[in-house]
């Protein structure tokens, strides 16, 4: 029987991808471009981010101008938390922090250690063992804290699902404040106070903060209340920026505003550990709007930005602010006015510097070594100790890279030699002995990128081979946590969210687990979903890809989750030269009227590429021997296609936008051609969009596709709204 295993055919030498090109909206694009004096390509990109009015665009481009609500107005338990901490500090009782071993958890722990010591607290910390105990506070830690005379336990980046350990702490008479950002369980733990953005309004600008964001809000609010914030906020903001980007938190709302500022502070960091980490990793600050990058700076083997989520929509450069008037607005959460005319503040790090350089060096320690190394790095004021710890991070990250490469190659070899049929299974389950638990999540992301299907990768626990422990990474149409819930009866411990998860189960259930996941995958995945998705903002001609456009892209920065770097495409591009460089990358010279260089990371398997192709890419600046040039980072390539304005990736002659009222509320609706099907989009006054494709009962509801939730449009509240929209469109 023929094997339909959906690996890229060897003879084709092309990545196995599907392209989603956002539909053009020429009238809105023209208006934004003219008013804001920006390129139509940038205007179209803003529209693709659900920013379609002048007011929305101005607020997005200048986040410092937005008046933020005070955190105490948004977080119901913040006042209780501040009272508990204030009383504990004033009585000189012990505070203990329980952190986590990822970059978010370690930066959160370091941030609160610094802040509480600055405020006069007696404070210590503990982080559970990744290999022996797994994620989150546990009863052992609670018992040890109690024996040490701890009066108040403060969790960071964990605790929201730890009902039993928190209940035990209460039995022992220990006060507990939970600070976390993970999903809310059916039953909240019995803590004295819980700070979690998932418990506040979905429209709050604080909704997207990571664990380090919650820790930052708590620390700054406490310092403000005690009148001891002088000299504290700036270093805390640096740690907030490191943790937020490394954790892949959405760079929207308060995250966008604070990260934008933190990236300017980092090159001149007051923290010895940050200085040492920047020095060891070779990161250099750039002038705003120029973003110099040495040859090969973003290489994937330097670090793993996505650290296991299988996404390539992470943040890049930063907005040019050097000519702005200083803002006269002050807010306690960010420390007041930023003088953008200061020479120091005209240089900035970029999210890539953290995502590909600093973050992986921190994360590697939590994955395969002792998190105490990072905590000491980020809390010491001794430059000698900081350099020692930074060098340890460097060495550990190199070990992590080697482990990832070895495991990835072994996993690929298993996939190539197996008889698995991915079009039938629709999910890839790979389990092998001897793999390191700490890095298999990264490998899962790479396998998703390679094969385009959800990946569940595991290895056996050290003691015997009775228990399998693993990590999972999904694709947009597949909800990882729901898949694990579907297999609940087969699993021991598990957790996660839409894009990623972790699990353990008895080895004897491996075949049943694989079958169960395949059954779930068939409920949500079609054959066309089994290719990596490349979302593309607009078509550009090579001659448009100049430094002026590159500097305008800075207006969108910092980019990252929910504000991805712009991706453009060009058709019928000739490849005049191509060669393998580094560890399996392709270096290309392209011609389409103009000549431009390009790099395709980890595409060695597709070498050589056809001589004429359509390409999808991001722009980057490459500096070599003092010369700067625009270079393209290829994300997608396909054989040339004749795509007309009325083709599968562009809107047909449907009305651009129609306004209508339903239940006395205003809405707008529009119809687009997406591939072979039509998609109806309905937007309410809050900016939420309901998107329904022809013939489907399940639609997407949210402010962006990345954070949208699935809804059943046959429910009455949606069904009648859809009927009203179709009537308005005269369908």
Where are these regions (language model features)?
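Short, ordered loop/turn segments at secondary-structure junctions
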Residues: 100-101, 128-131, 158-159, 181-184, ...
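Intrinsically disordered, low-complexity regulatory tails of plant transcription factors
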Residues: 162-163, 247
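Hydrophobic helix-and-loop "lid/oligomerization" segment in the mid-to-C-terminal part
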Residues: 13-15, 22-151, 224-289, 303, ...
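Short, basic, low-complexity termini and linkers enriched in Ser/Thr/Gly/Pro
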Residues: 281-320, 326-333
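Acidic, two-metal ion nucleic-acid-processing modules in DNA metabolism proteins
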Residues: 8, 117, 122, 256-281, ...
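Short alpha-helices
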Residues: 190-228, 233, 237-245
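Short Gly/Thr/Asp-enriched flexible loops that form oxyanion-binding sites at enzyme active sites
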Residues: 108-112, 163-172, 181-182, 189-190, ...
């Amino acid at each position: 029987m023929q094997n339909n295993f959906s690996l890229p055919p060897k003879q084709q030498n092309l990545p196995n991808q599907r392209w989603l090109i956002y539909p053009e909206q020429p009238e809105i694009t023209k208006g934004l471009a003219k008013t804001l004096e920006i390129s139509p390509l940038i205007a179209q990109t803003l529209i693709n981010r659900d920013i379609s009015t002048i007011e929305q665009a101005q607020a997005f481009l200048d986040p410092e101008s937005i008046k933020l609500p005070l955190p105490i107005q948004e977080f119901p338990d913040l006042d209780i938390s501040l009272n508990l901490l204030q009383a504990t500090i004033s009585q000189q009782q012990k505070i203990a922090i329980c952190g986590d071993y990822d970059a978010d958890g370690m930066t959160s722990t370091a941030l609160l250690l610094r802040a509480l010591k600055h405020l006069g607290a007696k404070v210590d910390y503990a982080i559970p063992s990744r290999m022996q105990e797994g994620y989150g506070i546990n009863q052992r830690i609670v018992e040890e804290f109690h024996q040490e005379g701890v009066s108040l336990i403060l969790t960071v980046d964990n605790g929201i699902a730890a009902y039993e350990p928190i209940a035990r702490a209460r039995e022992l008479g220990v006060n507990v404040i939970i600070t976390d950002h993970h999903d809310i369980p059916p039953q909240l733990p019995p803590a004295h106070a819980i700070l979690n953005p998932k418990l506040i309004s979905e429209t709050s600008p604080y909704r997207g903060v990571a664990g380090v964001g919650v820790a930052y809000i708590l620390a700054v609010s406490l310092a403000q209340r005690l009148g001891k914030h002088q000299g504290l906020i700036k270093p805390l903001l640096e740690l907030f920026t490191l943790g937020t980007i490394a954790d892949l938190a959405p760079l929207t709302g308060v995250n966008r505003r604070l990260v934008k500022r933190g990236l300017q502070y980092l090159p001149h960091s007051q923290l010895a550990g940050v200085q040492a980490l920047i020095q060891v990793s070779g990161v250099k600050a750039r002038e705003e709007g120029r973003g110099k990058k040495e040859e090969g700076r973003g290489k994937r083997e330097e670090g793993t930005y996505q650290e296991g989520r299988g996404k390539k929509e992470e943040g890049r450069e930063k907005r040019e602010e050097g000519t702005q008037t200083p803002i006269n607005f002050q807010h306690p959460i960010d420390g007041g006015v930023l003088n953008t005319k200061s020479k120091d503040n005209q240089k900035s790090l970029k999210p890539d510097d953290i995502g590909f350089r600093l973050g992986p060096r921190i994360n590697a320690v939590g994955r395969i070594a002792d998190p105490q190394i990072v905590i000491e790095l980020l809390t010491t004021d001794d430059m000698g100790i900081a350099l020692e710890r930074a060098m340890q991070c460097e060495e550990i990250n190199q070990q992590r890279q080697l482990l990832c490469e070895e495991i990835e190659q072994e996993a690929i070899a298993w996939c190539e030699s197996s008889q698995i049929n991915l079009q039938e299974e629709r999910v890839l389950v790979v389990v092998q002995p001897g793999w390191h638990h700490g890095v298999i999540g990264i490998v899962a992301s790479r396998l998703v990128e390679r094969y385009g299907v959800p990946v569940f990768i595991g290895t056996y626990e050290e003691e015997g081979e009775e228990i399998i422990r693993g990590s999972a990474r999904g694709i947009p149409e597949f909800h990882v946590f729901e898949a694990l819930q579907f297999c609940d009866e087969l699993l021991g411990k598990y957790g996660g969210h839409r894009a990623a998860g972790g699990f353990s189960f008895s080895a004897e259930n491996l075949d049943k687990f694989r079958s169960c996941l395949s059954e779930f995958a068939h409920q949500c995945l079609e054959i066309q979903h089994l290719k990596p998705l490349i979302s593309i903002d607009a078509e550009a001609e090579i001659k448009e890809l100049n430094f002026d456009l590159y500097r305008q892209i800075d207006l969108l920065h910092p980019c990252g989750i929910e504000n991805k770097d712009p991706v453009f495409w060009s058709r019928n591009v000739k490849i005049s030269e191509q060669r393998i460089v580094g560890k399996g990358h392709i270096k290309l010279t392209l011609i389409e009227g103009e000549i431009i260089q390009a790099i395709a990371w980890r595409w060695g398997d597709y070498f050589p590429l056809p001589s004429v192709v359509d390409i999808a890419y991001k722009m980057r600046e490459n500096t070599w021997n003092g010369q700067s040039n625009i270079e393209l980072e290829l994300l997608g390539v396909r054989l040339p296609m004749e795509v007309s304005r009325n083709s599968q990736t562009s809107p047909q002659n449907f009305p651009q936008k129609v306004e209508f009222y339903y239940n006395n509320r205003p809405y707008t609706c529009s119809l687009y051609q997406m591939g072979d099907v039509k998609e109806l989009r309905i937007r309410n006054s809050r900016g939420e969009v309901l998107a329904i494709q022809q013939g489907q009962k399940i639609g997407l509801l949210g402010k962006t596709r990345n954070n949208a939730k699935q809804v059943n449009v046959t429910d009455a509240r949606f069904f009648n709204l859809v009927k009203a929209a179709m009537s308005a469109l005269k369908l």
